[in-house]
Structure formats: C-alpha cells, structure tokens
C-alpha cells in the first residue's frame, strides 16, 4: 500500500514537473533564446519538439535532428523532487560543464534533506517544531518520543513537497509508520504538530537583491497541507495573506535569511506556520511548482515584474556565472 502511494505521488510530481516546464517554456523569450523541452525519465532522456521526440546523448547532453547535432548552452532546471532538487542532476551538469539555473549540487542536497534544513534554520535563530531524526541504521527506542505530544508528523527525510508525510495520532500508528518509512530514504523525521496560520513565501535573487514576491496563506481541505492539497487543488490560497504587517515583515525576514545563507539561486518557495505571531519554518522548495496555477507564478502576477523577465534573468545569470 505504501509503495503504491509513493508511486502515485511520484507520478503526480512528474506531471507537475511537465506542467511547470511547459509554463517556463512559454515564458522563455524566443527573441533571445532557442529553447527545447527535455524530459528526463529514468532510462529515457528525450527532447520533445513539435510532436517529435529525439533521444538525448547522456555523454554530453546533446541530441540530433537528422545529421544535425544540437548542443545545449544552458539548462533551465524545473524537475521537482529527484534528480532536480536533490543535487543529482546538478552534479551531472557540473561534470559535463553545462551551466544551469537554480542552486548548485551541495545547496540543493541540503534543501532536500529535511533534518539538515531544520538544523540550518535553527542555527539562524528561526523557530522550528520540536523534532527527532532517526537514521536508517538506528535501533529505535520509542521512549525517546515520550516528551512529544500527539498528533505527530512522520516524514521521509529526503523528500520535498510533502511527499512521504503522515500524521499519526498514537504510539501504534507512530511505530507502524516509522517501520514503513525507515530505509526508503536517508532516515525518518518525527515532528510535533503546530497549529497556526500556514503561509508560503516566493522569492529569488534579482538584480543584486533578494526579491520577495508575496506571502500566500494556505487553507487546506485536508488534515494538513499534503501533496494532494499542494498539487490536486485541495486547498484555498489567499494572496496576499491576511496577516498584520509586522508579522508579514518577520516572515519575509526569515525567508530572506534562509535563502541568503543557503546561497540559493533562482526561484525558491519557503513555507512557514505562524504560531502566536511567531513564524516557524516548515520546508523549502528550491524548485517550486511553476505551472500557471502554482503559488509562485500567482505571487509574481501580483508583483510589478513579469515571469518572462525573471526567466530571462535566471538564464543569463546561469550563463554568466
């Protein structure tokens, strides 16, 4: 059952990557660039162009149309999850010397590791939920959870976008879910539930400063803002969030602090929950959803900037650095 659920979630994530990619493709300025859509599946890397498909040569990330070899100068990375957000595709492009948008391999790896991200945020003085990390080779003594209050969240440690997240209400559910998840990734994270106002912040480095596009309040139909709420429309989103200015300023400050200190590049989305006026860090997406219905593009539409200009800036930034 767990494996089927993971496969279903991964299929949804793949579909979202394609929707995000199509929206980015639409917003690439063809007066400046000659773009192609590349789909990367496990054993099938291919270019799709005008209804035709061309195999990618993985040795140098080129492809052929007839006898004409086409070599990419830059990659706009819009793969959600692995290998786009965990540093793997970045390592590959580093090896073959093709520049790419978004964070480098090491920074992407940190953003995809929930526990490392939480430790990082705490070290910056940002509040986080009480949590316990369990490594794959650890013998779990369930007494370590006695100081934590149910309900708890059990999460695979290396996953984005609320994949592999379950809310548990008692010790039996906790034990079952930890046993199900251990070994599927690089550990399991158990967190206390926070009750408050959940918000999402879209931001990027733009022309020498970290630009925050807006704060969106998320009201989910589900028990929490899980992958269905994020990707299947089971949530209401209010942009800009109806929160007081002083709290809004603090959320922006925390988001900028994380972005800057992680040395991120390009689009990012950082989620917080506001409890008693204090923002608690939840998670970070270094490659946020970019379909037309996604939070980030909606925030951009309410700013004085155009997505096309931001995309051009990111491509030029990758080429020039």
Language model segments and positions:
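Single conserved hydrophobic/aromatic residue that forms the stacking wall/gate
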Residues: 1-8, 12
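Conserved N-proximal alpha/beta basic substrate-recognition cap immediately N-terminal to
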Residues: 18-130
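Conserved metal-phosphate-binding beta-hairpin within the catalytic cores
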Residues: 192, 201-203, 259-292, 300
């Amino acid at each position: 059952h767990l494996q089927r659920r993971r496969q279903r979630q991964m299929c949804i994530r793949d579909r979202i990557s394609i929707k995000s990619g199509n929206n980015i493709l639409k917003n690439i300025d063809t007066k400046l660039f000659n773009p192609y859509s590349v789909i990367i599946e496990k054993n099938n890397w291919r270019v799709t162009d005008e209804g035709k498909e061309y195999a990618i040569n993985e040795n140098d990330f080129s492809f052929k149309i007839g006898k004409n070899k086409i070599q990419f100068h830059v990659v706009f990375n819009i793969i959600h999850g692995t290998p786009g957000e965990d540093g793997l595709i970045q390592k590959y492009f580093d090896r073959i010397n093709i520049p790419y948008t978004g964070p480098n391999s090491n920074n992407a790896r940190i953003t995809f590791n929930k526990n490392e991200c939480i430790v990082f945020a705490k070290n910056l003085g940002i509040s986080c939920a009480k949590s316990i990390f369990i490594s794959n080779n650890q013998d779990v003594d369930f007494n370590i959870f006695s100081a934590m209050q149910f309900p708890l969240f059990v999460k695979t440690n290396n996953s984005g976008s609320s994949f592999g997240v379950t809310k548990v209400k008692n010790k039996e559910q906790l034990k079952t879910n930890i046993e199900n998840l251990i070994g599927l990734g690089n550990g399991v994270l158990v967190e206390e539930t926070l009750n408050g106002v959940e918000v999402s912040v879209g931001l990027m480095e733009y022309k020498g400063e970290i630009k925050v596009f807006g704060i969106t309040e998320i009201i989910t139909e589900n028990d929490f803002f899980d992958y269905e709420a994020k990707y299947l429309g089971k949530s209401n989103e209010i942009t800009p969030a109806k929160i007081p200015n002083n709290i809004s300023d603090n959320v922006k400050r925390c988001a900028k602090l994380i972005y800057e200190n992680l040395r991120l590049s390009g689009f990012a989305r950082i989620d917080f929950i506001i409890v008693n006026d204090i923002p608690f860090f939840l998670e970070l997406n270094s490659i946020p959803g970019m379909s037309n219905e996604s939070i980030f593009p909606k925030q951009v539409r309410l700013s004085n900037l155009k997505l096309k200009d931001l995309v051009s800036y990111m491509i030029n930034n990758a080429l020039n650095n």
